[in-house]
A protein has these predicted regions:
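Mid-chain, structured segments of secreted extracytoplasmic proteins
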Residues: 61-99
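Asp-box/WD-like beta-propeller blade repeats and closely related beta-sheet repeat scaffolds
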Residues: 110-148
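Low-complexity, Ser/Thr/Pro/Gly-enriched N-terminal "stalk/linker" regions
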Residues: 1-73, 108-116, 129
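A short, mixed-charge helix-start or loop-turn motif at secondary-structure junctions
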Residues: 28-34, 76-81, 133-137
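Phosphate/oxyanion-binding loops and surfaces in catalytic or ligand/nucleic-acid-binding neighborhoods
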Residues: 17, 104, 124
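Well-ordered alpha-helical segments within folded domains of soluble proteins
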Residues: 37-54, 86-103, 142-152
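Structured catalytic/translocation cores of nucleotide/phosphate-coupled proteins
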Residues: 76-77, 95-101, 117-121, 125-126
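Proline-rich intrinsically disordered, low-complexity coils
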Residues: 20-23, 84, 108, 125, ...
């Protein structure tokens, strides 16, 4: 079996066994009895599926990514389980999916959600040097992955 077949089988199983409420790639929360929320890990996976769609043209990747993000994003651009006042860069990461999805499927609510996340960044606490704090609960801390998460 070639690499492409292995990847296809793996991704197919991952997608077929995942929902926004219970993603197969992020089961730690579920095992702990917690509800899945808008989060960093899901943002990484959905971004990867969008990139797979762009590489392969396989509509199922885009459809899954769109359905997944659509579950969280409300018509007015608010996002379920996302509180901008937490000032948590981890929650900004999933917002990267909105750029491509808006370009690819054109849902106005995705554009509105981008604005919601942008408003957080406008007021995100910063160090005296102007760098974003990683989270409000970690005053003056800068984390390396924050560079990845807070840049589109």
């Amino acid at each position: 079996m070639g690499c492409n077949q292995i990847l296809d089988r793996y991704i197919k199983q991952l997608v077929e066994t995942s929902t926004p409420q219970a993603p197969a790639w992020n089961i730690e929360k579920l095992r702990a009895g917690k509800e899945n929320t808008w989060n960093y890990i899901d943002g990484c996976m959905i971004k990867a599926l969008i990139e797979l769609y762009e590489i392969t043209g396989e509509q199922r990747y885009l459809t899954f990514a769109d359905d997944y993000i659509d579950f969280f994003v409300q018509e007015d651009g608010t996002i379920k389980h996302y509180d901008p006042q937490e000032y948590n860069l981890d929650n900004v990461n999933a917002g990267k999916t909105l750029y491509k999805l808006y370009d690819l499927v054109g849902k106005p609510k995705y554009r509105a959600a981008m604005d919601t996340i942008y408003r957080q960044l406008e007021t995100q606490p910063r160090t005296k040097e102007g760098v974003f704090w990683h989270k409000a609960v970690y005053p003056n801390q800068i984390w390396l992955d924050g560079m990845y998460m807070a840049q589109p």
